[in-house]
Amino acid sequence: SAVTGVPFEDAKHLQNETGIFIDKFYINQSSSDFLYDVMTEYGGCEAFYTDFYMNFVCPLGIVRMNAKGNEVNCNYYENKKLQEALKPIILESLQNQIDCGIDTSVCYCIGSGENFNFLSKINEEHHFFDTIIPLEHPRFIMQYNSKNKDVYMEKYLCALKS
């Protein structure tokens, strides 16, 4: 997502779905594959995006250098100093999105750990959403629990259809 700027959209799906090609970044992420599978089961991308708005808690794509010298995705919550520095930007971004008229009765938080904890904390302070439902992160599912992918897909679909 840091490469494309589109939530959970890798370069492969972006090109296949929209025709937009990002040179030198034609990669496929299992997180994106998982969410596309959920969307397909939901009724397809058009049905999904007709019913849901998807975006990041943090609007910035952040990368860091790994031990091999390669740029890798970095989540805003991996570094507490970074998280605090970005908090005003995050709050402004969330408010701007809400000001566009999105339904704030339910927020599905992709990431049931630190992302959910941070979003819940700022929601307690700012009352952005009536309810926040945590869903396991697709990377966690695909990297550590791929044998239970169907169980997690069903969890996503039940939450989204409730």
Q: What is each stretch, according to the model?
A:
Residues 109-110:
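Short beta-strand scaffold positions
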Residues 162:
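Charged phosphate-binding loop/patch that engages nucleotide di/tri-phosphates or the phosphate backbone
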Residues 123-128:
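Short helix-capping segments at alpha-helix termini
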Residues 1-106, 116-120, 133, 143, ...:
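A polyanion-binding, active-site-adjacent surface
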Residues 129-143, 147:
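Phosphate-binding/catalytic loops
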